[in-house]
């Protein structure tokens, strides 16, 4: 787990961090933890650990510092010291459902939790029905702030659809997915492409999936199981999903890629629209595409801003609930109540607004209204839908697993000699990597296609540094053969990373299926050790998605502390993908789960 501790420590790293060389990516579904201390001093005997969703984690860190320094007292005269850790909502929900484990989950066990939406409370409650533990106290949650789900679009594209005069909804997204931009007089923009997160881990992905099902039925409340399983509803949602570029576990991945394209004067070349929390659109327009609040108003603003389109056929208000957990003692419950009351005071609510949130009553600040193009300064009524029941929400997630856009993935595994080195736990890196790769096969949909390559350098048995072992084929037909082939890999030779990445992407391009998410996943424990192809700049030019008419994303996984993570990050960023950090081999299984969430 990637952990940040201490008030003076480094800031949270976002999923993609802009650098002069490109975008450096880190694993978003891993916990990023930061504890803060304030001026209340060592006499504060009540310690409260709050776990926050990532998009407001920076702000809660700031406000916890302010609270700790405020000198506030609880009813019994004691004072509390609040510390904050931050975790994506879906990951935190799973941790709470299993029973929080600090070592496994990478953060202290919280006594209070504030996810992005009460949808996660609904899912956690449902999971708790099969457990002998109490997962929630039953207390009514307090909303700290709000932010509606919105469709972020580059302004020229939104205007081409009719924004802001015309009401735009999910049916317009479906129509554009089917007909492309040529239907609106812009064939130069090509296909309509949608950025959307995985609903199992991301609130915006979950909310967008729920909203699409509601739009399919024309309802705004009381969605039923029969309506979720109705063939017409499923066809509608499947049609929306067909336009997805690829799935992600954090919407900042899309925002970072948009910012890079914008910086190169190609803002309309990447995604036509991204389903996100409205607040992230504000951050993007204010120069912070990755959500780093230090850049808010100071980072480079985009040449082509995004506007917030609120679907007229239904969207959800994300309510940022604050709940006390069963792990809290009586004193911690009192501290949680006082901290939440502090957060609802006018000064703190104003800080939420300045960061692009609406206040807990749904009122937009002037900064947000101007930044994202809210009609009537944000006073126009939104077409809000009611959150579905736990049973229906579970059915929506199950349906998405079937209806989502399917993938065509080429898995490229490093079999260089260094993979024989120990990885801990009595196994080699090769053994740990094979185990993780085999386990990951169970995360794909049966209709997803997966192929396998291996690479090192030339050996006595192989005249090329890379070799195709199995071409992509559906998991339902080829899983057993993939398992056998992965388990049969052996390690020798050096690491011909650059030439393999280039060849793998070209192979994926030659077999490109436009109706699928096409991707390459490279797992390596080292750095390039191949003199015949040792020019990183040339590789980055060859795979640069902004310079190619067609491109395939290359997701990289750094496996071992010898892996060249910076270079792997540049490779992935050049293809508008993500690099994942598994330099601690103990986390490789969780890393692979995160990788597969892109598909």
Where are these regions (language model features)?
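Periplasmic-binding protein-like
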Residues: 135-151, 234-248, 295-328
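Ligand-binding pocket segment of bilobal, Venus flytrap-like solute-binding proteins
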Residues: 211-308
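Von Willebrand factor
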Residues: 403-473, 500-501, 519-524, 556-559, ...
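Extracellular/periplasmic juxtamembrane helices and adjacent flexible linkers that interface
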Residues: 2-22, 26-32, 323-413, 431
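VWA/integrin I-like adhesion module and closely mimicked acidic/polar interface patches used
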Residues: 294-303, 526-583, 587-595
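Short beta-strand-loop
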Residues: 422, 448-488, 507-514, 531-537, ...
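A conserved helix-loop-strand patch within extracytoplasmic ligand-binding domains
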Residues: 128-202, 209-210
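Early extracytoplasmic/lumenal segment of secretory-pathway proteins
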Residues: 3-4, 11-22, 26-130, 137-138
């Amino acid at each position: 787990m990637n952990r940040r501790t201490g008030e003076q420590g480094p800031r949270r790293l976002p999923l993609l961090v802009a650098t002069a060389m490109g975008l450096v990516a880190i694993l978003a579904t891993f916990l990023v933890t930061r504890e803060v201390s304030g001026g209340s001093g060592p006499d504060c005997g009540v310690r409260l650990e709050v776990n926050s969703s990532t998009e407001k984690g920076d702000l809660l860190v700031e406000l916890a510092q302010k609270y700790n320094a405020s000198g506030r007292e609880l009813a019994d005269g004691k004072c509390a010291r609040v510390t904050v850790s931050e975790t994506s909502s879906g990951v935190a929900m799973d941790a709470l459902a299993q029973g929080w484990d600090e070592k496994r989950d990478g953060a202290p066990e919280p006594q209070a939790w504030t996810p992005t939406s009460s949808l996660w409370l609904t899912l956690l409650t449902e999971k708790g029905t099969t457990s002998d533990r109490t997962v929630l106290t039953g207390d009514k949650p307090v909303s700290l702030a709000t932010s509606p789900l919105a469709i972020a679009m580059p302004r020229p594209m939104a205007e081409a659809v009719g924004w802001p005069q015309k009401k735009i909804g999910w049916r317009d997204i479906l129509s554009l997915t089917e007909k492309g931009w040529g239907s609106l007089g812009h064939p130069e923009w090509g296909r309509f492409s949608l950025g959307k997160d995985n609903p199992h881990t991301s609130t915006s992905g979950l909310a967008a999936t729920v909203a699409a099902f509601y739009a399919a039925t024309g309802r705004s409340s009381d969605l039923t199981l029969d309506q979720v399983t109705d063939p017409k509803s499923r066809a509608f949602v499947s049609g929306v999903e067909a336009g997805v570029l690829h799935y992600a576990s954090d919407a900042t991945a899309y925002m970072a890629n948009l910012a890079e394209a914008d910086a190169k004067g190609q803002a309309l070349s990447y995604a036509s629209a991204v389903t996100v929390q409205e607040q992230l659109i504000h951050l993007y327009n204010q120069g912070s595409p990755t959500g780093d609040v230090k850049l808010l108003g100071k980072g480079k603003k985009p040449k082509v801003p995004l506007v917030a389109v609120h679907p007229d056929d239904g969207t959800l208000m994300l309510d940022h609930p604050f709940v006390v957990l069963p792990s809290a003692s009586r004193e911690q419950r009192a501290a949680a109540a006082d901290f939440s009351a502090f957060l609802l005071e006018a000064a703190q609510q104003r800080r939420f607004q300045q960061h692009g949130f609406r206040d807990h009553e749904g009122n937009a600040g002037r900064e947000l209204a101007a930044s994202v193009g809210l009609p009537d300064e944000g006073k126009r009524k939104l077409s809000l839908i009611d959150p579905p029941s736990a049973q229906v929400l579970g059915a929506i997630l199950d349906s998405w697993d079937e209806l989502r856009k399917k993938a065509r993935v080429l898995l490229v595994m490093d079999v260089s000699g260094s993979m024989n080195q120990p990885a801990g736990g009595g196994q080699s890196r090769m053994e740990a990597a094979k185990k993780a790769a085999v386990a990951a096969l169970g995360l794909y949909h049966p209709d997803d296609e997966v192929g396998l390559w291996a690479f090192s350098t030339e050996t006595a048995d192989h005249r090329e540094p890379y070799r195709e072992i199995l071409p992509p084929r559906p998991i339902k037909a080829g899983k057993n053969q993939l398992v056998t082939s992965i388990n049969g890999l052996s390690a020798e030779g050096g690491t011909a990373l650059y030439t393999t990445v280039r060849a793998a992407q070209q192979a994926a391009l030659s077999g490109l299926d436009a109706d699928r998410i096409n991707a390459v996943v490279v797992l390596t424990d080292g750095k390039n050790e191949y003199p015949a192809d040792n020019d990183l700049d040339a590789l980055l030019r060859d795979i640069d998605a902004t310079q190619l008419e067609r491109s395939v994303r290359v997701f990289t996984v750094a496996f071992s502390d010898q892996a060249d993570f910076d270079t792997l990050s540049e490779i992935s960023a050049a293809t508008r993908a993500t690099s994942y950090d598994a330099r601690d081999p103990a986390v490789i299984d969780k890393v692979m789960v995160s990788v597969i969430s892109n598909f």
